[in-house]
Curated annotation (Swiss-Prot):
Compartment(s) of residence: Cytoplasm, Nucleoid
Designated gene of the protein: rdgC
Pfam families hit by this protein: RdgC (PF04381)
HAMAP family hit by this protein: RdgC
Name assigned to this protein: Recombination-associated protein RdgC
Species assigned in the record: Salmonella typhimurium (strain LT2 / SGSC1412 / ATCC 700720)
C-alpha cells in the first residue's frame, strides 16, 4: 500500500453518487497507453494495486482508490535549440538567404517531431481517494496543477465531476498565525518546530524557521511586524505529522510507526489483504484528521 504523502482536498459540490462498479467501466475507456512516437505526454488509469490486480478501482467502507499514470517525453531546451540552430544554418547556407521568423517557427515544430522518437520518458503515478461517505476527493500530490490534471482525467472519464477545493470559513493563514502567536492550538494538535512566515505585502519577505521553538520572542517579532504564518508543521494525536499550508493543502504526511505497523500480522505475501487493510486504516485516520483540521481551523465555508 502506498501511504499518501500529501493531500489536496476537494469537495463534491453537488450530491452525486459514485460507485466503484460503474466507475470501473467508465475508467476502462481511458486506461493508460504509452506515448506514440509523436506524443509529448499521455495520461490514463492503471490498477491501484499494480501488477497484483487488473481492477482500476479498489473500494472499502465507502472509500474508493484509483490511480492515474502519466508519461512525459523529456526534451531538454538546449538539445532543441542546438538542433534548431544547426537546421537553420544549413538551410540558410543552402538557400543563400536569412530565414524569416515564421519559417524558423515552423522549423522548430519540425525539429521537435524529429527528436521526439529518441526522447527519454518520465513516468509518474498519482493516487486519488474518493470518500463517498463525506463527499470529498483527496489527491496525493503536492501541486494544485497535478491535482487538477488528475481531476480533469476523472471528469473526462465520468462525463462530469462537480468539485471545488475545500474552502474554510476563516482564512487559514490567520488561524495558523494565532496558533503560533498564542502557543495554543486546536484540540488534538501540537505545534512542531517548523513554519514559514510571509509579509502581507507582496515584496515584504519570507521567513523559514526549522528546528526552532515557534512560541518564542524571535518569531513573535515577525508576527508583530505584520508577517503571517503560511506553512506550519503540526502533530495530530501523536499519530500523524504534517505541514498545513495556507492554500488548504496538507503536505509531508508522516504516519507514526505504531500506525504503519498495525497490520504487520497480515502475511506480506498476501498483497491484496494487506493492501485492503492498510487502505482501510489510512483512509480512516486521514478522514478523522481532515475533520479535526476543518473544525480546528474554524469550520468549512457555507456552500
Amino acid at each position: 500500500m502506498l501511504w499518501f504523502k500529501n493531500l489536496m482536498v476537494y469537495r463534491l459540490s453537488r450530491d452525486i453518487t459514485l460507485r466503484a462498479e460503474e466507475m470501473e467501466k467508465q475508467l476502462a475507456s481511458m486506461t493508460f497507453t504509452p506515448c506514440g512516437s509523436q506524443d509529448m505526454a499521455k495520461m490514463g488509469w492503471v490498477p491501484p494495486m499494480g501488477s497484483h490486480s487488473d481492477a482500476l478501482t479498489h473500494t472499502a467502507n465507502g472509500q474508493i482508490i484509483i490511480c492515474a499514470r502519466k508519461e512525459e517525453k523529456i526534451l531538454p531546451s538546449p538539445v532543441i535549440k542546438q538542433a534548431l540552430e544547426a537546421k537553420i544554418q544549413k538551410l540558410e547556407a543552402d538557400q543563400g538567404r536569412k530565414l524569416k521568423k515564421t519559417e524558423k517557427d515552423s522549423l522548430k515544430d519540425e525539429v521537435l517531431h524529429s527528436l521526439l522518437p529518441r526522447a527519454f520518458s518520465r513516468f509518474s503515478q498519482t493516487m486519488m481517494w474518493i470518500d463517498t461517505v463525506n463527499g470529498l476527493i483527496m489527491v496525493d500530490c503536492a501541486s494544485a496543477k497535478k491535482a487538477e490534471d488528475t481531476l480533469a482525467l476523472l471528469r473526462k472519464s465520468l462525463g462530469s465531476l462537480p468539485v471545488v477545493p475545500l474552502a474554510l470559513e476563516n482564512p487559514i493563514e490567520l488561524t495558523l498565525t494565532e496558533w503560533v502567536r498564542s502557543g495554543t492550538v486546536a484540540q488534538g494538535f501540537q505545534l512542531l518546530d517548523e513554519a514559514e512566515l510571509k509579509a502581507m505585502l507582496e515584496d515584504g519577505g519570507v521567513i523559514r524557521a526549522k528546528k526552532q521553538d515557534l512560541v518564542s520572542d524571535e518569531i513573535a517579532v515577525h508576527i508583530e511586524a505584520g508577517k503571517v504564518v503560511t506553512k506550519l508543521a503540526l502533530d495530530w494525536q501523536q499519530r500523524i505529522q504534517f505541514v498545513m499550508c495556507d492554500d488548504g493543502s496538507i503536505k509531508r504526511l508522516k504516519f507514526c510507526d505504531e500506525l504503519r505497523d498495525q497490520n504487520e500480522d497480515i502475511d506480506r505475501e498476501d498483497f491484496a489483504q494487506r493492501f485492503d487493510a492498510d487502505f482501510i486504516l489510512m483512509t480512516g485516520e486521514l478522514a478523522a484528521l481532515i475533520q479535526s483540521l476543518v473544525e480546528g481551523l474554524g469550520g468549512e465555508a457555507q456552500r
